[in-house]
């Protein structure tokens, strides 16, 4: 149960993390997220006026902090495509938690623009960064991002980010059977002794455009089996309650890896994350079918108290645990799930 005064949902799960999508656009067309046959030249992305402004985002974050949020992650789409993203980072970096501590302010990126923006992001107050990287082999990486983008450019961005101090830097690899699962060991080998934490994520049924099927999932247990065949691994305890990754370290001290088993070992029971979409809708689950329109309140003249009360009401009524129900075979039929590119991963 959360500490006294923290906002909790129907299962006692505290509101602690807020993921904010700052754009629905991306310069990649990854096959599991924004497949090119759907997100083509005719796809209607949001207009700038539909996006939350930086001032609106800052106001929202202040209100979420009042309810106990301590960690903010900026996502997309690709967040580095949002013009002047450094200014938003600077605005949010000035804020403190309810306990007077600096916010844990992070960002997830595909790394394509990271080399040119890393220093400015660090100077603006970004704490650290997570990079999505689904292969170390260039041909495989180009096929996964489907825009013929070279892996060397992302690796350069990672090096620059690490050099300017956006650390500990994490890398997320979504593992899809038959597409990039042959990259598990090579990616691990590349980042051993680098100080970078590599995490392997089970391919998820987020949205409906990626044509997900269970047969394409490589279970985390299989990922660990393959890694253990190449390197001696030792389990690590969680850093904090509700951590999504199961942590492991190399026995020779070469670093840390993790697996995120969102399909085979769902962690809904201690999920503390809310998501704010690009146009200001509050989603309580990555697999949600609908959100609560907070932008309408902001632009309709609602007071901070009215918006804060809306956040409280929505979170306290939260019952979401889709992944646990999916795993047990009892997930009810749902409507059209929101796409990952709209609310971030």
Swiss-Prot record:
- Record's signal peptide: none
Identify the metabolic or biological route this protein is part of: Cofactor biosynthesis; molybdopterin biosynthesis
Q: Which Pfam families match?
A: Fer4_12, Mob_synth_C, Radical_SAM
The record's comment on cofactor binding reads:
Binds 2 [4Fe-4S] clusters. Binds 1 [4Fe-4S] cluster coordinated with 3 cysteines and an exchangeable S-adenosyl-L-methionine and 1 [4Fe-4S] cluster coordinated with 3 cysteines and the GTP-derived substrate.
Q: Would you kindly state one Gene Ontology biological process term found in this protein's UniProt entry?
A: Mo-molybdopterin cofactor biosynthetic process
Q: What function does this protein fulfil? A: Catalyzes the cyclization of GTP to (8S)-3',8-cyclo-7,8-dihydroguanosine 5'-triphosphate.
Please state what the protein is called: GTP 3',8-cyclase
